[in-house]
Amino acid sequence: MADLLTSVITRVAYWPIDIPITDPFVVATGSRVVAENVFVRITLSDGTYGYGEAAPFPEVGGEDRITCLNALSGLAPTLIGQSVHGYRELAARMAHATPLQPAARCALETALLDASCRSAQIPLWQLWGGADVRPRITDITIPIATQDKTLSLARGWYERGFRLFKMKVGKDVDGDVRRLESLHRALPGISFIGDGNQGFSRKECMAFAKGVQQFGGVMVLLEQPVVRDDLDSMAAIRRETGIPVAA
C-alpha cells in the first residue's frame, strides 16, 4: 500500500464538457443531442491523479450541469488534505452533505477510487476483492426512435458483436413491442433489457412484458419501469412477469 503521506489530496479540479451524441438519445421522459457533463480530476501529493465524470440527466434524476457544478464547488474543498485511501468515509460525508446530488458525488467518488488505485498500483477489481476477471457480456443502449431507425442502429451494433440490447421504452406500449419484435425477427440470438425510465404505469409495463413474451423475445431485466417511489408496482411487476426489476 502506498505511503499515506504521499496519498494526500492536494487539488480537486473540475470543468464542464459538451459531448456530442451521434444520434439523438431519446427516453420516455426526455431527449438529448449533447451530453452536458462535468469532468473531475483529483491530484495527490505524490503527483498521482484520478479522474471521474458527472453525467447528469435532469429528465431522470433532477440534476443538471449547473447543480453539479454548484455541488462540486462545495464538496471539493472538503477533500483537500484528506488521504485518498479514506474514500469510504469521504463518500459517506459527501452523501450526508449533498444527498440530492448523486451525479456530482459519483464524479468525485470515481476520481477518489481511480487515484487510490493508481497510488497503490493496483487495479480496481483487486481493491474490491474481485478474483474473477473473465470477459463479461455487456449491453448497448438503443434510444426511442422509429422502427426503421431502431433496426438500423441495432443492426450496426449487432455487426460489432453485441447481442444484448438495452431498449429505451415507456412512451408507447404497442410501438415499443413492435420495435423489439422487429429486432427479434431480424437479429438472431439477441435478448433485451427494457429501460422504461419511469415512463410506464404498472398496467402498461405488464402489457409490454406480455407483448414481448408473445413474440418470443427474451427479456432479462426491466429497468426503472415505473416512477421510482412506486415500490408496490415494482414488486408486482417482478412477481407477475417473473422478470427481474432494477430501479
Language model: regions and residue ranges:
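Active-site loop segments of alpha/beta catalytic cores
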Residues: 201-247
